[in-house]
């Protein structure tokens, strides 16, 4: 989870445009899976449940819950997980929030992230610093590399000659391996000045 969250954050935050950090992604918070549809509040979920599970029987309760977990809106609307206290520190014990707190809050919460120097939170902080310190993230043209590659998503941010002369930065290479497999790549012909950020110590 941690390595994947760092990778996804890196891919998004080093692209062109204005990035935003939304609803606990800087902690690596995950979608929730409730085993009772009553725990969801989204009206579309309850409408679909009534149509396809209760009335027509076209979809089993188990399959619908899996679908909701993957595609529903409430799965990412759970309360912010601040610490491992009751309700994840979002509200006092005995107070019922609009949605239940994700049951994984004892492990995934802001306090735990602050206590772990290798957490998703600190990677996001590094991403923000990188954007501030390297103008190419703001000015560089986006160039997708090898769009046929089904394992690796890689792109360049490339400065114009004028911006490169002003900043000393010609190109920034971003590589994201979406698999568990080790891959060998040679996008830059071996000509890399430095690695500015990585989510894995296995990089070589």
Residue ranges and their predicted role:
Residues 1-204:
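Active-site and adjacent substrate-binding regions of carbohydrate-active enzymes
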């Amino acid at each position: 989870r941690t390595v994947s969250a760092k990778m996804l954050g890196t891919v998004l935050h080093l692209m062109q445009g204005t990035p935003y950090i939304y609803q606990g992604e800087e902690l690596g918070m995950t979608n929730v899976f409730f085993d009772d549809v009553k725990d969801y509040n989204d009206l579309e979920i309850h409408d679909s449940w009534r149509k396809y599970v209760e009335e027509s029987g076209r979809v089993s309760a188990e399959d619908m819950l899996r679908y909701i977990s993957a595609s529903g809106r409430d799965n990412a609307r759970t309360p912010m997980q601040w610490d491992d206290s009751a309700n994840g520190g979002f509200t006092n014990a005995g107070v019922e929030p609009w949605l239940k707190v994700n049951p994984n809050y004892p492990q995934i919460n802001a306090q735990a992230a602050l206590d772990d120097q290798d957490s998703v939170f600190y990677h996001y902080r590094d991403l923000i610093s990188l954007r501030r310190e390297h103008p190419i993230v703001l000015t560089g043209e986006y160039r997708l590399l090898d769009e046929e590659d089904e394992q690796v998503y890689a792109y360049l941010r490339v400065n114009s000659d004028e911006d490169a002369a002003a900043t000393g930065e010609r190109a920034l290479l971003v590589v994201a391996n979406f698999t568990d497999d080790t891959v060998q790549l040679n996008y830059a012909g071996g000509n890399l000045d430095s690695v500015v950020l990585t989510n894995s110590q296995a990089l070589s």
